Amino acid sequence: MNKPRLFIDSDVILDLVLQREAHFEFAQKLFAQYQQGKCVLYSSSIVLANMHFIIRKLHDITIANSSILFVNKHFKIIDANNHDIENALQSKFSDFEDGVQYFSALRSKKIDALVTRNVKDYKHALLPVFTPKQW
């Protein structure tokens, strides 16, 4: 049986690496599934760049760098291309970043579902979308 391949949005990864109290439990359970070999985790280079910016502002560059190294070790990273950007601009996504991530994941043909706390931002998605709690 193939393991589900999950694209994890930045909010969920930040919940995990920063242990954000309100959401850490479900992000940690999702990561535990990966550690048990029950799923494969994906994210994007855009997520890594945004995470570094956010963590550096909240903490410092050392914590930002170690967080990125953690994600880079455990997640497969998908890149965005020109078509993903054009598709995001022409789509019904109200959040450009979410659109780029979605079209990158869709184009890769490697993703079975998206996991995010912002499910409402993906209401036009063709891929299944779950919160960490739902997954």
Please annotate each region the language model reported.
Residues 1-5, 103-135:
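Acidic, PIN/NYN-like endoribonuclease modules and their adjacent C-terminal/linker elements
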Residues 1-42, 56-63, 133-135:
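Short, well-structured N-terminal submotif of metal-dependent ribonuclease cores
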Residues 12, 47, 84, 101, ...:
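Alpha-helix capping/helix-boundary segments
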Residues 28-31, 68, 101-102:
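Short amphipathic alpha-helical segments and helix-helix/interface helices
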Residues 43-47, 64-77, 118, 123-135:
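Anionic, Ser/Thr-rich low-complexity intrinsically disordered regions
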Residues 73-117:
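Active-site neighborhoods of divalent-metal-dependent phosphate/nucleic-acid chemistry enzymes
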